[in-house]
Amino acid sequence: MIILGIDPGLTVTGWGVVAKSGSRLSHVANGQIRTDNKATMAERLVELDSALAAVIDIYKPDTGAVEEVFVNVNPQSTLKLGQARGVAMVAVARSGIPVAEYPTKVIKKALVGTGGAEKQQIQHMLKILLPGVQLAGEDASDALAVAITHANMLGSHR
């Protein structure tokens, strides 16, 4: 089974793809999508949608998961993040792929054992779970964490 994880953001969206075979996970790919901050909001959302559609077309995931939005101190930032997250969910769902959602604390707890884990702890655990993985950046590592969480949740529901 091929699983796509997405860490949505308007400036940078991370994506990660893992393969699950039984209880074994392996890294397939990861990357980051940067939108042009000089473009209009609509243009940036289209750019994000197109890039995610390309990732889905290349890796053909069986299922996907998106990190839930956290409420930011700045309402504008929260709104922009929510719009990027909506585009990510639509990109996956439009492809006929089931899409799940996980809060940040659930993802951190699934990977590190505590919902208050730091980014460095997540990256360290990714290198243990996916030996040899080269991370494209923090957002890509967060997306791989989303994919691994989804893989584990799928396994626990069977």
Curated annotation (Swiss-Prot):
Protein name: Crossover junction endodeoxyribonuclease RuvC
A molecular function GO annotation: crossover junction DNA endonuclease activity
Keyword Kinase belongs to the record: no
Catalytic site: D7, E67, D139
Gene name as annotated: ruvC
Gene Ontology CC annotation, any one: cytoplasm
InterPro entries for the chain: RNaseH-like_sf, RNaseH_sf, X-over_junc_endoDNase_Mg_BS, X-over_junc_endoDNase_RuvC
One of the protein's GO biological processes: DNA repair
Family matches, as NCBIfam families: ruvC (TIGR00228)
HAMAP family on file: RuvC
Its EC number(s): 3.1.21.10
Subunit structure: Homodimer which binds Holliday junction (HJ) DNA. The HJ becomes 2-fold symmetrical on binding to RuvC with unstacked arms; it has a different conformation from HJ DNA in complex with RuvA. In the full resolvosome a probable DNA-RuvA(4)-RuvB(12)-RuvC(2) complex forms which resolves the HJ.
Family, as annotated: Belongs to the RuvC family.
Lineage: Bacteria, Pseudomonadati, Pseudomonadota, Alphaproteobacteria, Sphingomonadales
